[in-house]
């Protein structure tokens, strides 16, 4: 992650996230930290509202819990099962911002992530934000503690933390 983010404050307005042009990826460890796991989730929908002042801006996103993919068929099935995400009963993972703050040289989008009905705070570090003729482009990173969401099965075998990278494209509505 760069030491300084490239952040261009977009024009005030409401922007709809484009699921087809956005991506959510993660990296974690398993097998007692010996091996890495990389994968993705699929964005269903989301909205960003830029205000003046920008610190009052808001964002929300809905992620498809059943879209978890890591390239390991048995692992993917297990993560989607009642052992972890229980995607059949809790099909959505949601993020709702609570505030946008300047933290030194970077911007943090503070909010709540809800997984399997359990909410926990999360800070999304905005590493890039820019506008172009197609709308708004944002990159952000965050670290999710699965234990904070009561996803505590298979300690040691499945990593506790997921390092997430969100790349989002949004169009002004």
Language-model regions, residue ranges each:
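Low-complexity, acidic/polar, glycine-enriched regions of mature
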Residues: 1-173
């Amino acid at each position: 992650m760069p030491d300084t983010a490239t952040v261009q404050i977009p024009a005030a307005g409401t922007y709809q996230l484009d699921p087809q042009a956005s991506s959510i990826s993660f990296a974690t460890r398993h097998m007692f930290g010996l091996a890495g796991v990389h994968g993705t989730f699929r964005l269903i929908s989301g909205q960003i509202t830029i205000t003046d002042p920008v610190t009052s801006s808001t964002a929300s996103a809905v992620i498809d819990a059943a879209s978890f993919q890591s390239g390991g068929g048995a692992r993917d099935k297990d993560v989607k099962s009642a052992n972890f995400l229980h995607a059949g009963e809790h099909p959505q993972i949601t993020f709702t911002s609570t505030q946008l703050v300047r933290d030194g040289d970077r911007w943090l989008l503070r909010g709540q992530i809800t997984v399997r009905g359990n909410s926990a705070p999360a800070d999304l570090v905005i590493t890039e934000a820019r506008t172009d003729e197609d709308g708004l482009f944002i990159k952000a990173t965050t670290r999710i503690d699965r234990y904070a969401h009561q996803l505590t099965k298979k300690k040691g075998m499945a990593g506790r933390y997921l390092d997430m990278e969100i790349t989002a494209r949004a169009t002004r509505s």
